[in-house]
Amino acid sequence: MAGTDPRNRELSLMDKQISSLLEICLNSNLYSINLHCNQISKIEGLRHLCYLQHLDLSSNLITKIEGLDSLASLQSLNLSCNKLTRVEGLEKLFNLKKLNLSYNSIQDLTGLIPLHGWNHKLSHLYLHSNCINSIDEVLQSTVGLNCLLHLTLEQNAKGNPVCHALGYREIILENLPQLNSLDGLDRSGDPVTAHEVDSMDLANLDFLEYLITFDSGRKEVKESLTGPVKTARIDEVLTKYRKHRDSSEAINLNTDGTSSSEHDVVRFQDNSNMLREMRIKKLEDQISELLVKASCPKSEQTKLKAKRDTDITTESDSESTKENRKGSTTKRTPGCHKTSQTSKQQANQQLKGRTSYSELKQNVSRKQSLSKRKTDIETSLSSGRTDTDSTGQILGKPHAIGGSLKKKGELVRNSIEESTYRALVQELDQERERRWKAEQVVLKLTENIKELQSQAKEEKGINSMAVYTTDRIKELLLKEKNAKSKLQELIHHLREENEKLMDELKKLKCKEEDYQKAYKSMEDTLAKLETQNIQKQALEMKQVQETERKVSASQREIDLLRVALRQQKEKVNQLHEVLTSKEQLHRKELESRVALNGPEFQYALAQEMAKEEHHHSQQIHSFQEKINLLTQQYADLEDEFRAALIIEAERFKEVKDGFDNVASELAEHKETVHRCRQKEKQSATLMQELTTMVKEQKARIAEITKAKQEIISDLKSKIHSLEKVAEEGRQKTVQTELLKKEKSKLISQLTAQESLIDGLKAERKIWGQELTQQGVSLAQDRGRLEAKIEVLSNEIESLKKQNERDADALRIKTKIVDDQTETIRKLKEGLQERDERIRKLREENIELEKVLQEQSDERTAQLEELKQKLERQTERKEEVKQLLEEKEAELEDVKKAYSAMNKKWQDKAELLSHLETQVRQMKENFDAKENKLIEERDKSLQCQKVITEKLRSVDDAFRRQLESVLSAHQAELIKLASDKQKEIEAANERVYQVEEEMRHLLKETANSKKIMEEKIKRLTGALSDIQKEF
């Protein structure tokens, strides 16, 4: 169990307000434990975790390192952010590779001395932010750590008092040749990568591969800025469990599109600042020397200068004079031009670096001082700029001739000095311009940094949400893993119990064989005793014959025999009493004992057998019903999966049909493209976003169970953007409404799929509950079987006791026979002695034969009585033999019963093996069905991938067709527009011609009207004249 399933051996209880390790039920098969940010004050209850490799107890209240002696497999130990004052209790951690004791109050490192040598494997040691004072103690405790590669006593400006000692780094690197890096820097001073130093930080996070780094947002930020931005990755932050992170992120911006590390930038800035300061000092020295030189000849002129000449020139005047005289200064001062070029290069390099707030203050102060110096220099220059006319007016007429000669010499000198001053002032102006540009760049950079920090905070919030979701998903997976592990433990426990029962059966069989061997040995001893008894009877007959022959030998021998007979009579009486008492006891026992062949015992056995058979048949029937139910449920699940696949295929077809409908609608609306080009562009962007949404949703359907909340957040953001675009599109076109309807359909499909997934999860939970019920029923059956086993074991013990009693009776009988044999031996010895005595007394007996003949009759009668007694004893022996035969018959009956019990046990063992085979078959069938389902799921995923690829290809082809159609349509529109313009022009010309014709016609009609009116007037006049004449 310990090595089969390593995924079920992780425990994460971060920030659960745990105050003691004894509150947690820790499985002995755990691989890693994370108890970060709790209230644990003592390390205890970890002795049984022999497989533990990663232990995180950071951010707790631990004051002493203890209770870790039994963790032989521990590889990484994190005790940072606790209340430790010394290192101890690490002697038996032979496999420890990484030890983090940072952010404590450690002063004593002597606990690292037992880790010296090649037996321990400590390679990473973190001791930053502690109270270590002496280098000697550090060297003493770390010299013998032969595997130590990375030692950190200072990190992120949080170190120990030792780090401030002179030559601290050189001393430690000289005395510890095994070190590769000290405080995150290798022996050459280069920073060590996080992969080399923190290669073991990802011990218990299994689900970080499902977290998405937000690169798209960063790309937008990079495009908005002048250069790329580097931020700390989310995965590296998660590996450090979000503790003791640096508040400042490494953000490097470049104006030319290239970025460098912060370390190089800081060095370069220091070098450039030093060069600038040296250059400014040289310029100040040159200006001071020139001022000192110019002070002597100018002291006379300053008295005679007018106030209007001593006014300070403005920046615009100085700049104009600089521009007018730039050519002369460049010719005279090539060195200054070189310095200006170098200063430009330095300014460009300065723009590549990152400036801090303190540097900005220094630059501002320097600029103020330079501006003051510049104004002083300009005042001096303006004071030196005097015209010949003004000087002539001030000096007056009497000194005009002598002063003119002096002025010429002074003007020559002043021109040289002014040229040098102007060059220096130009350099200062250039420096000022560069500083001003740098300030503007710094302001832009600070604004960009603020924006990036706000974005980083938002990303941190999103990452925290992602971590929370991963924690919840991990907890759910751990619960499922624990449930699976519990079921496996139950199965393993049942197997162990079955093995124990099999072992007990084997032991019982061995005991049976031992009993059979003992029974055979008893039979052999009984046969030997019977042969010995037969031999003894033959010897007794011989002795009786010898006694009959020798009775007439001597009366003394008869007296002795009488005494012996009396003694034997007493012994026989005692034996008779003992035998009668034992016979009575044995009869009582037989009366109280139930006969194995009796009807009552057989009736009880038959009832119990019938009950057990009925119960066994019921169990088999219940198991078959459960199997049928499980098969039906599995078939129902398969049908549901198939129905879900069919529904998904139908929905995919519906989406495709909707997509085709949209394409047809777009083809229908091509006629109105010339009126709403901008609207079509917006709709095209919306279509692209919707197609990307569809692709993302289809690609993430398989990953919904792992990253559901992330997908929902993305969907919400995209839905908000789509809603904004849709609000604009509602006012402009009807097409956006159709797209919104399709979007709502897609959302409803997603909700339906989520409901299906929830239903599948509920069915999975029901399935787990049914499995638990089956486990409970199996446990109940196991309890019943254990009760039956206990009853049968009690019966076996009673039978054993009966066997022991029978064996005791047999032992008693054998002891009686042994006593009889001892008496016979004693008689034999006495007879031998008597034979010797008889031999001695034969002579005496011959003399007394005559006297004893009369007494011989009486003695013969006594001998007859003795013979009768011997016959009775023989009859008693025969009765004892019959009893032995009966006991043998009883033993045979016991053997038969024992064989029947063995058969029953074998039948039960066969039943158990049959049940085991059925359980294995069920498990194999279940595993096969699971594999089939997994294969079907993989096939469906592959089909989905193929379909998505086809959709993408179709989408690309459709886009190409759309682009080609749009281009053709645009060309046609252009042609139509040109044709229509031509037609409009022709129509306008025709209209103009028609208007002219109409105007001409109107003029002609007007003329004709006038002519007609004149004719009518003439006619009326003529008619009136005719009437007058008549």
UniProtKB/Swiss-Prot annotation:
Domain of life the protein comes from: Eukaryota
Region (Disordered): 298-401
Keywords from the UniProt entry: Cell cycle, Cell division, Coiled coil, Cytoplasm, Cytoskeleton, Leucine-rich repeat, Mitosis, Repeat
Residue ranges, compositional bias (Polar residues): 338-368, 378-393
Name of one Pfam family that matches: LRR_4
Positions in coiled-coil regions: 432-645
Main localization category: cytoplasm
LRR repeat ranges, renumbered to this chain: 7-28, 29-50, 51-72, 73-94, 95-116, 121-142
Domain LRRCT as annotated: residue spans: 160-200
PROSITE patterns assigned to the protein according to its UniProt record, in alphabetical order: LRR
One GO CC term, this protein: centrosome
Basic and acidic residues: bias regions: 300-311
Disulfide bonds: none
An annotated GO BP: cell division
Family listed: Belongs to the LRRCC1 family.
Role according to the record: Required for the organization of the mitotic spindle. Maintains the structural integrity of centrosomes during mitosis.
Name of the featured protein: Leucine-rich repeat and coiled-coil domain-containing protein 1
Lineage: Eukaryota, Metazoa, Chordata, Craniata, Vertebrata
Gene: lrrcc1
